[in-house]
């Protein structure tokens, strides 16, 4: 198949540091190419995906800017709809692309929803029912029932990029944005209750600065100690942090749609201790790859009770369950179904059926195919 992957113009593919969606796009490009497909990624000019690359902006436009994303999407769709392009599937990870897909209804478009429930974007998706929507966790899909999500495909990473760690650093780790929904203040409190140091990797985005100063900086400066902030980390120092940690703390306070850092931790053998929100219960296999706890007190108790945890078993289970090759194969199967459905519709009508892009499209699609959900093994 000839496949176009449309990413954002805000972060490189793969990302240098922050950028979970862009890491997934990079893994898709790599493994779809490995499976024999002709892949073109639309991203920033400094990106290095497998296959071909096209770009509108040489460097990432950060912070994200709506105007830049629209120009990036316009550039991508100009190339996608060129007579010589002949893409079989366009898989976009960027919302503005949907507007361009709507004026090219003959282009088979797949869109992955990477975010939690957002009323503004739900209205956008309702306007473009001709796309095939993909979710990244069952919980995410449950929270946006208005959208016909055809399939849930859980993320995956390249296990060979994650060497085993011994967890002998004597600390627990936190990785993520220093934002209220990520719970860095809860991680500090749990580690202090457990009597261990917490080493923290992550950046502070401008909207989260007041929270950081009020909840995190205040804890760092209160004299209790036991906290090391490492700043935002690229791949190598992030792995070093995870490999030496006794556990990775994931005390989120929101409906996180997935959380790639959980499987990164598991792939080096470090268990994840997380609060029961969003996809956490889908990703953590209790007692094997981590533990789901209800609050800071339970998190602290679990930190103190990690002696005897089988890191080798954790890592092997993660390698079986969370590989990006598995993720790519599931996408490949979805693309094939989308193509088959499209070809069947054209044979039935003899011409392009413009109703596929209209208000009845979602209803017609439901009649053709029942939604499928990929569940964890």
What is each of the regions a protein language model found here?
Residues 1-361, 365-368, 373-377:
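Catalytic cores of nucleotide-sugar-dependent glycosyltransferases that transfer UDP/GDP/TDP-activated
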